[in-house]
Amino acid sequence: MFDTLFNKVPELSILAEDLGELRHQVYDLRDHYHLKGMYVFQFHYCYDFDFHKVVVYTGTHDNDTLVGWLDSLEKEDYKKVSTYIANYDEVHDYQKIIHYCLDLEAMHVIVPVWDMMGCDTSARFNVPGKIGSPNWEYRLSSFEQFDSYLEDYKNMLEVSGRKGV
């Protein structure tokens, strides 16, 4: 199937959701077709990765927000995370994590809006296994709410060499 797909659309880019415990055949298939995998900071911050093979995420739609996640960390885990972001000057740890992710060598970095705005757990988009409200209902009340954060991220993008990407 992938052979046919890539023969018909050679420039096609596919992202493989390669999270969790997977059989080696999944990784073999991903690598054979040069599919991008996923690096999610909340899961992988203490693991080595080939960042050219992944799309970097601060978190996904199934994770807590960065602020909520940081608040829930055990002391030892928080110390580990702190070692990765110690050299960043941003005021808040969630911003330091975003900057760290932008500095990684991955071509693409995805940062959910609730992470960019430093939202707490109350803004969590989805809790797997939970049905109904408030899952899948996150909304900005206005873009003005988001505008105040743009200058900080513009600077991070510049410093990380991602401006215009």
Give the location of each predicted region:
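Catalytic cores of glycan-processing enzymes that make or break glycosidic bonds
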Residues: 1-165
